UniProtKB/Swiss-Prot annotation:
Gene: yrdN
Pfam families: Tautomerase_2
Keywords for this protein: Isomerase
Species: Bacillus subtilis (strain 168)
Protein name as annotated: Probable tautomerase YrdN
Keyword NAD assigned: no
Amino acid sequence: MPLLRFDLIEGRDQSSLKKLLDVAHNVVVEAFDVPQQDRYQIVHEHPENHMIIEDTGLGFNRTKNLVVLSVTSKSRPEEKKQKFYRLLAERLESECGIASTDLIVSIVENDNADWSFGLGEAQFLTGKL
């Protein structure tokens, strides 16, 4: 159950935003082997001057198409994370026109006790999930 939070510069139209979210979800399903209906995405849009995202010395420029993706997830093997990064960059570029240099991903891991999907229960601990 990854939770994806997207920080974007405001101005994308609804169809572009939907495509971005759909592509990201399909990559999560493929790379992390989660069920199709396991979809949790939140979008935060910011004025351009509210995001200062540089290249960390890698030598490229960012554009207004910038996507900063924070993923909260249970622990995943390194190879699945690498697959996620690669597929996401490839598909956002090919399907959404977002350059791989405009993608930043951070994965924060947590454990089964850190999730409740409602009803005041930790369903991963109770066995309901």
